[in-house]
Amino acid sequence: MESIIEDVRVRKILDSRGNPTVEVDVITWNGFGRAAAPSGASTGSREVAAFPSGGVDEIITEVEDIISSELIGMDAVDLQDIDLVLKEIDGTENLSSLGGNTVVAVSMATAKAAASSYNMPLYRFLGGNLATSIPYPLGNMINGGAHAGKNAPDIQEFLVVPVGAEDITEAVFANAAVHKRIRELIQKKDPSFAGGKGDEGGWVPSLSNGDALEIQATACEEVTDELGVEVRPSLDLAASEFWDPEIEKYVYRQENVQKDTGEQIEFVKEIIETYDMYYVEDPLHEGDLEGFAELTSLVGDRCMICGDDIFVTNREILREGIEMGAANAIIIKPNQIGTLTDTYLTVKLALENRYTPVVSHRSGETTDDTIAHLAVAFGAPLIKTGAIGGERIAKLNELIRIQEEIPYSRMADLPF
């Protein structure tokens, strides 16, 4: 059969931060798939383990000695069975034996090999003929928090989304235009700014949160007027990064201010209303489903309140959030949960409950473009994958190619 696995190969490669990660090749009788795993800087405590204690070098041996022998002879099309075998080999709840990065690289490479065996693109193999919508890109403009230095804003990501774009090409270039405009505005505010960038390609200025918000808003307005494409500001606060559990407050070091949960909710609500935010991710720490629910009840009819660290692509945790009305969107990062099967099941649960799935990169990335295909296959309205940088534009340029391949493609339907 065309898709019977004949070999599984693994190697250590670099990610965008210069750290080691794993890349896997799966070879079938008539196909080939390659995938590399990313890694995050700000991670949820309930994510699966990225690698075992021995790191990437231990994984090389595990794949060559154990995983390869188990998968050879299996049909790559039977992805659910293969993912189950990977979890059985690992034998732990959090994939600490093999590591979620290893499992996701094998899982994605297998799916690619299956698609290749039947001469199909991955988005078509996974999504079928109904996979015709292209996601809007969330672009990272200013980096702060865990993605930047000590003088940067506390808020981790100042994002934009070109909601008025008619196609993905227009969307990608609108984001790039905002990125350039923001540098100009930063340099006008601070002539000493040398153009430093963070892990995800956003600028890293020495600005307060308030000044960064003003620059973000101004750039969106100016580019919207110039291009005739509406661009809306968005945020990822990554609030767990500045939540202090000992004093139970959010510590904003730039302004030397501390906020309790009620003050944090009011602060985020005020930002959403003042700057017409389209999307806000992780506005509260990862253990505060109640706070997420309260904020969603206040602004969820006009702003996406998205959970990343709080859900970690885990459908059982998402189910808890759904029951409480916590958030109305969820970040989808395959390496948080380990397998494509589990990733798909989380997306399915989200869509069934009107939670918007947002397929996302990680801060430590590679030029692997798999998530572009997953976003189209899953029908995700948004993809979060930066605005510039080789490892970021690999996904964006792949979306442009996918759009060309689908003669009846359209931009995804947004919730508002």
Curated annotation (Swiss-Prot):
Catalytic activity of the protein: (2R)-2-phosphoglycerate = phosphoenolpyruvate + H2O
List of catalytic residues: 200 (proton donor), 333 (proton acceptor)
EC identifiers of the protein: 4.2.1.11
Keywords, ordered alphabetically: Cytoplasm, Glycolysis, Lyase, Magnesium, Metal-binding, Secreted
Cofactor note: Binds a second Mg(2+) ion via substrate during catalysis.
Pathway: Carbohydrate degradation; glycolysis; pyruvate from D-glyceraldehyde 3-phosphate: step 4/5
Record has Transferase as a keyword: no
Residues that hold (2R)-2-phosphoglycerate according to the record: 156, 333, 362-363, 384
SMART domains: Enolase_C, Enolase_N
Database matches in InterPro entries: Enolase, Enolase-like_C_sf, Enolase-like_N, Enolase_C, Enolase_CS, Enolase_N
Cofactor: Mg(2+)
Gene3D superfamilies reported in the protein's UniProt record: Enolase-like C-terminal domain, Enolase-like, N-terminal domain
One Gene Ontology term of the molecular function aspect: magnesium ion binding
Any one cellular-component term (Gene Ontology): cell surface
One Pfam family named in its UniProt record: Enolase_C
Keyword Phosphoprotein: no
A Gene Ontology BP annotation from the UniProt entry: glycolytic process
List of residues binding Mg(2+): 236, 281, 308
Subcellular compartments: Cytoplasm; Secreted; Cell surface
Record-stated family: Belongs to the enolase family.
Function, as annotated: Catalyzes the reversible conversion of 2-phosphoglycerate (2-PG) into phosphoenolpyruvate (PEP). It is essential for the degradation of carbohydrates via glycolysis.
Name of the molecule in the record: Enolase
Encoding gene (name): eno
